[in-house]
């Protein structure tokens, strides 16, 4: 079976911006002084690979300045990273040299809005999009990669509040209107699972979890409905959403751990895929979570069901799963409501070679994920939107592949400052940039 190929690069706009002269206060809610503001010959021809000025503050600015210890051992933040805002033309030159023909990046909500359009931000993205298209590089544009404008967090607690749905729709409407004549691949939200769990359950990310996830799904669906009704007939683009995925295998062959593994698939993958394909949450989640899990009314269920033209799949790891008691020492949360826990090792050793921190390589897992989506969710059109190595499972509807990432960035996770790029741009600081030997 032949597949097609496109690019190599992904770089988050939110992570390449420099916040200007931020001053922050120890208040609740948090406030700041600027709140207002590979080888392609085996692939078909149309397969896709991807290998600030005027910006207001977002929740990551506030979070990392108020709690610098959560920025990793180097107390890092995103004030200055690999500088794509200033060096986007050089980035495009590098992509061209590498033969990339797809680039996935995110729009920084706080650079464009939230209350009125920011012309400096709009010009930057217009220039970037035009520059990509001039080099025959297809832009894949994400509307939200966790960088909520701080003003919306301060006003009504962001995704905890239903009001976010219409604000997100208004922001998306502005983006479709300004950029949609040239952008034909839109992603609403990156990794639906991440903000509810890491932001509202673990506390490692800038801010519940079930309410936040529910509002994310509704915000996503409303934006998709807007695009399909108002813009798609003329602009002829596609719109989807990105799922962070993992694969799960039983810790051992006991029935309890096999059952725990299946439950966990529903809590991790089904939590979002069941609403997107059936308009409801998985039955096992309804049973175990109970009243803490919101419900879609009939109108909402119809809106959410089928609200994607394609899915982005991010994959990095596979974990062993084992059962835990129904009444564990620590109270149940979104992270263990499935009555399961995770490990990278079982009695036979690690699940794969060590990568970094507590992560291990397990490339086979992405094949398992793709097969799962093929058999359980109707074989949707898929772009692998973050991954480090290309692996395709025959029969799965995979259209493109994006390696993470173009430049080493400020990683939104503890131990933030490590190299993640198979080809990386060295931290510039006016020194220019050049590819590493990995390219």
Curated annotation (Swiss-Prot):
Its EC number is 3.2.1.147. It catalyses: a thioglucoside + H2O = a sugar + a thiol. A beta-D-glucoside binds at residues 145, 190-191, 316, 386, 404. Residues 1-19 form the signal peptide. GO terms for molecular function: thioglucosidase activity. One of its GO terms (cellular component) is secretory vesicle. The active site is at residue 386. Glycans are attached at residues 33, 336. Keywords: Glycoprotein, Glycosidase, Hydrolase, Signal. It comes from the Eukaryota. Expressed specifically in stamens and petals. GO terms for biological process: carbohydrate metabolic process. Belongs to the glycosyl hydrolase 1 family. This is Putative myrosinase 3. It comes from Arabidopsis thaliana (Mouse-ear cress). The gene is TGG3.
């Amino acid at each position: 079976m032949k597949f097609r190929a496109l690019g190599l690069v992904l770089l988050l706009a939110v992570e390449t911006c420099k916040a200007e002269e931020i001053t922050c206060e120890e208040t609740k809610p948090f406030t700041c002084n600027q709140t207002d503001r590979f080888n392609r010959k085996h692939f078909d021809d149309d397969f896709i690979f991807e290998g600030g000025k005027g910006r207001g503050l977002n929740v990551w600015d506030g979070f990392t300045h108020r709690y610098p210890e959560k920025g990793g051992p180097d107390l890092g933040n995103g004030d200055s990273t690999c500088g794509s805002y200033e060096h986007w033309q050089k980035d495009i030159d590098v992509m061209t040299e590498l033969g990339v023909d797809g680039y996935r990046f995110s729009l920084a909500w706080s650079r464009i809005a939230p209350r009125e359009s920011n012309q400096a931000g709009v010009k930057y993205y217009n220039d970037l999009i035009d520059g990509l298209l001039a080099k025959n590089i297809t832009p894949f544009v994400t509307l939200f990669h966790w960088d909520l404008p701080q003003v919306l967090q301060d006003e009504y607690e962001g995704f905890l509040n239903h009001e976010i749905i219409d604000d997100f729709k208004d922001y998306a409407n502005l983006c479709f209107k300004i950029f949609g004549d040239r952008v034909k691949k839109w992603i609403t939200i990156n990794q639906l699972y991440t903000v509810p769990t890491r932001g509202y359950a673990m506390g490692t990310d800038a801010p519940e979890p079930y309410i936040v996830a529910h509002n994310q799904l509704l915000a996503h669906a409303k934006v998709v409905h807007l695009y399909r009704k108002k813009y798609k007939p003329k602009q002829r683009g596609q719109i989807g959403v990105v799922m962070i995925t993992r694969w799960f295998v039983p810790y051992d062959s006991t029935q309890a751990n096999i059952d725990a593994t299946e439950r966990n698939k529903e809590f991790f993958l089904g939590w979002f895929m069941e609403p997107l394909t059936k308009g409801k949450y998985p039955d096992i989640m309804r049973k175990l979570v109970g009243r803490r899990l919101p419900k879609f009314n009939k109108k909402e269920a119809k809106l959410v069901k089928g609200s994607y033209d394609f899915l982005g799949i991010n994959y990095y790891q596979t974990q062993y799963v084992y059962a835990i008691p129904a009444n564990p020492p620590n109270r149940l949360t979104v992270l263990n409501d499935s009555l399961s826990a995770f490990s990278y090792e079982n009695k036979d050793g690690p699940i794969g070679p060590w990568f970094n921190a507590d992560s291990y390589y397990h490339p086979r897992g992405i094949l398992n994920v793709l097969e799962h989506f093929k058999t359980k969710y109707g074989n949707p059109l898929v772009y692998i939107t973050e991954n480090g190595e290309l692996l395709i499972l025959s029969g799965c509807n995979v259209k493109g592949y994006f390696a993470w990432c173009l430049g080493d960035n400020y990683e939104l996770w503890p131990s933030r400052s490590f190299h993640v790029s198979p080809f990386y741009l060295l931290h510039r600081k006016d020194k220019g940039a050049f590819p590493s030997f990995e390219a």
